[in-house]
Amino acid sequence: MAQSSPPQSLQGLVPLGLLPGLGLGSAIGLHVSGLVLRFVRFLPFYATRRPSQPAGPARSTRTTQATAPRRTRPAPAGGQRQSASEREKLRMRTLARALQELRRFLPPSVAPAGQSLTKIETLRLAIRYIGHLSALLGLSEDSLRRRRRRSADAAFSHRCPQCPDGGSPSQAQMLGPSLGSAMSSGVSWGCPPACPGPLISPENLGNRISNVDPRVTPPYCPQIQSPLHQSLERAADSSPWAPPQACPGMQMSPEPRNKTGHWTQSTEPAELTKVYQSLSVSPEPRLSLGSPLLLPRPSCQRLQPQPQPQPQWGCWGHDAEVLSTSEDQGSSPALQLPVASPTPSSGLQLSGCPELWQEDLEGPPLNIFY
């Protein structure tokens, strides 16, 4: 009654009309059972594939994230870390070596030999020992301050009380050999040359150096008299300076700074008398040959008038002044020769001769030598 069913491998594969001996109902049932078996066979595939379809984009994003380059922090290199540790070890070795060298210089009274000292103890003992040595040698701050104060007091006590700048007497020993020679000659020196000392009134100063040329500068320090002023005082006691026609062969120069020289007599007294008489002197009395003559810086000129064949020599000063002595001040007034001033004609006016023009002065016949 029951018929054998076809093998399952043939179910659903054989068409309905090819199965001989089967009715229509059995053929439909067989066909339906084959479809069910086919569906059940492929069910795991559909069950696993349907949920995986919406997860496809997530899987793609995961793959892109895995393939994309990540920004990772660079790990510290092993060489740099090792070099930093080596530098630290080297620094500690150098510090330990320096402290050991410092402990060698500490005396046993400060640091016993068998005692181990830490770094801080070594530094404290070294500071204490250095302070003790500075106090013994006088190099501490208090000792140096006392020494400076003592030297300042000593310098202030050796200052010259009369000198406003506070110069010390040792400066006088460094002024040169001239100062030493003056001191050995017996001249009294009250203070160094930079110190003028107490001032003296002009009246007293004039009494001390009387009969001296007024152009001479008075001495700077009244307690010091140089050989120049002593020679001037000796020259003041001698006879006053005489005019050129009465001078001997050796005369003193009218300038106190000039040295002695030969002053020769140039012309005869008669010729000089004619020259002096020919000069025009206004209401003041004429020059007397007997009175002494003081001519500062005379310059000699040779005057050769046209009528006379022989040359005449005379002394002519640009600012010649005749100063009388202190004895004749009341009797004879000072005679002042006129100074040649430029006139519109630029000539030299003399009383006994016509006006001399510039062409005559420059020409060869006049022969005027300055």
Swiss-Prot record:
Phenotype caused by lack of the gene: Mice die shortly after birth and show caudal truncation and severe skeletal malformations. Lack of segmentation and impaired segment polarity of the paraxial mesoderm are the primary defects. Mutants show altered expression of MEOX1, Pax1, and DLL1 and lack of expression of Notch1, Notch2, and FGFR1. Mice lacking Mesp1 and Mesp2 die around 9.5 dpc. The major defect is the apparent lack of any mesodermal layer between endoderm and ectoderm and a defect in the migratory activity of mesodermal cells.
GO biological processes: mesodermal cell migration; Notch signaling pathway; positive regulation of transcription by RNA polymerase II; signal transduction involved in regulation of gene expression; somite rostral/caudal axis specification; somitogenesis
Keywords: Developmental protein, DNA-binding, Notch signaling pathway, Nucleus, Phosphoprotein, Transcription, Transcription regulation
Modifications the protein undergoes after translation, according to the UniProt entry: Degraded by the proteasome. Phosphorylated.
Skewed-composition ranges (Polar residues): 325-334
GO cellular component terms, semicolon-separated: nucleoplasm; nucleus
Induction of the gene: Down-regulated in NOTCH1, DLL1, RBPJ and FOXC1/FOXC2 mutant mice. Expression in the anterior presomitic mesoderm is periodic, dissipating once the segmental border is established. Negatively regulated by RIPPLY2. Positively regulated by TBX6 and Notch signaling.
Pfam families: HLH
Annotated bHLH domain residues: 79-133
Molecular function terms from GO: DNA-binding transcription activator activity, RNA polymerase II-specific; DNA-binding transcription factor activity; protein dimerization activity; RNA polymerase II cis-regulatory region sequence-specific DNA binding
Gene3D superfamilies xref list: Helix-loop-helix DNA-binding domain
Stretch list, region Disordered: 51-89, 231-265, 325-350
UniProt keyword Phosphoprotein present: yes
Subcellular location: Nucleus
Biased composition (Low complexity): 57-77
The UniProt record lists the keyword Transcription regulation: yes
Region May contain a degradation domain, residue ranges: 326-330
Major site of localization recorded for this protein: nucleus
Role description: Transcription factor with important role in somitogenesis. Defines the rostrocaudal patterning of the somite by participating in distinct Notch pathways. Also regulates the FGF signaling pathway. Specifies the rostral half of the somites. Generates rostro-caudal polarity of somites by down-regulating in the presumptive rostral domain DLL1, a Notch ligand. Participates in the segment border formation by activating in the anterior presomitic mesoderm LFNG, a negative regulator of DLL1-Notch signaling. Acts as a strong suppressor of Notch activity.
Stated name of the protein: Mesoderm posterior protein 2
Species of origin: Mus musculus (Mouse)
